[in-house]
Curated annotation (Swiss-Prot):
It comes from Trypanosoma brucei brucei. One of its GO terms (cellular component) is recycling endosome. Disruption phenotype: RNAi-mediated knockdown causes no defect in the growth of the bloodstream stage form. Simultaneous RNAi-mediated knockdown of MCA2, MCA3 and MCA5 in the bloodstream stage form causes a growth arrest resulting from a block prior to cytokinesis; DNA replication and mitosis are normal. Has no effect on VSG protein recycling. Triple knockout of MCA2, MCA3 and MCA5 in the bloodstream form causes an initial slower growth rate in vitro which reaches wild-type levels after several weeks of culture. Triple knockouts have a normal growth rate and virulence in infected mice. The lineage of its organism: Eukaryota, Discoba, Euglenozoa, Kinetoplastea, Metakinetoplastina. This is Metacaspase-3. Its EC number is 3.4.22.-.
Amino acid sequence: MAVDPRCLLSLCSTISKASSAKGTNDFVKIGMELWQTAQPYLVQALGLQPPPPKVDVDAAVANAGDAHGEQPWVATPLPGQTVRALFIGINYYGTSAALSGCCNDVKQMLATLQKKGLPINEAVILVDEDNFPGRTDQPTRDNIVRYMAWLVKDAKPGDVLFFHYSGHGTQCKSRGDSDEKYDQCIAPVDFQKSGCIVDDDIHKLLFSRLPEKVRLTAVFDCCHSGSIMDLPFTYVCSGGEQASGTPHMKRIREGNDVLGDVMMISGCADEQTSADVKNTATFGTGSTGAGGAATQCITCMLMNNQSLSYGKLLIETRDMLKRKRFKQVPQLSASKAIDLDQTFSLTEMFSVDRSVQ
C-alpha cells in the first residue's frame, strides 16, 4: 500500500476546536512542530546486561496508591469507562547510551491518539526531556514500576488502557524462573545504577491483577521486544516473517494466560534491534526529526487507515519498513487468539478465533 504523506499531513494540521482546552496541551500541534527539529537518531545496542533485582509487585501496587495522571485533552468520553495511558520515552541524555528520538516518539504517539479522539481520562508521561509538555516525572526504574502498577490499578470491566515505550531494549541472562536462556528487558534512564526491568516483571506488574473485559494496547519501540510482555499468543504467517501468506494466531507459551484483552505491537523480534529514522518525514507522519521506525510506521498506519484489520495493521507496518529497507520485523502478540480479520480498535474487546487452542 502506498502511503500518501499529504493525507496524514492534512489530518495532523486540521485541528478540531474541541480537541484542546485551557490547561491542556495540543499534541497535534506539537507533533507538527517536529518538522523543524531534524537531527540524527543513532541507535546503540546496550549488550547483555546483568540480571536486575526482582520487582516487588505488592510493594509497587501499594506505592501506586496515591499516583494519578492528568487529562491530556478534551474528547467525548466513553460512557461508564475509564481510559488511562502511560507513555515512556528515554533519550539517556549525557550518557554513553544516548539516543535522540525516543521523546519525539512519545510526542508523535500523543498527537496520533489526540487526532483519533481517544478520550484519555488520565495520562502519565515519563520522559527525560525537561521541557516536554505535560511531563509527569523522570523515567527512572522506580517511577516506571510505580506507574505500570498505576496503569492497571482499580481497572474494571470496560476500561481501556494504553501503554507506549520508546527507549533501549536489551537482554539479560534468565534468572532461572523460566525455560528461556535470556530475559528481554527495558532500560530505565537510571539502568546503570538501578538495573533494567525484565519481561517477567513487566508481565506481573501489568497482568497479575488485570480483570476480564479490560482492553489494553501496548507499543514497544525498542530492541529485543518481540516477546517482552510474555503474552501467550502471537501472529504467525505461513509465508514467513516478511511475507503476507496465510496469517493466523498461534499459542507459543503455556501458563501465562491473561484475563484481559491485551494486544502488543513490538518494534522487532526478540533477536533483532529496533532501528532509527534520521528524518521521519520519509514516513509521511507529518513530522521530521529523530524517531523510532516502528512508532512512525504504526502512527502512519493508524492515521491513514480508518478500517484496517489487526492482521492488515501488522502486515502493512512490516511492508512499510521493508520498503524503507529496514530489516526489523514488528511482531503482534496477544492474550487471546485474535480473529485477525476483526477491524483494529483501541477500545473494543477482541473477537476470538476459536480454532486456536
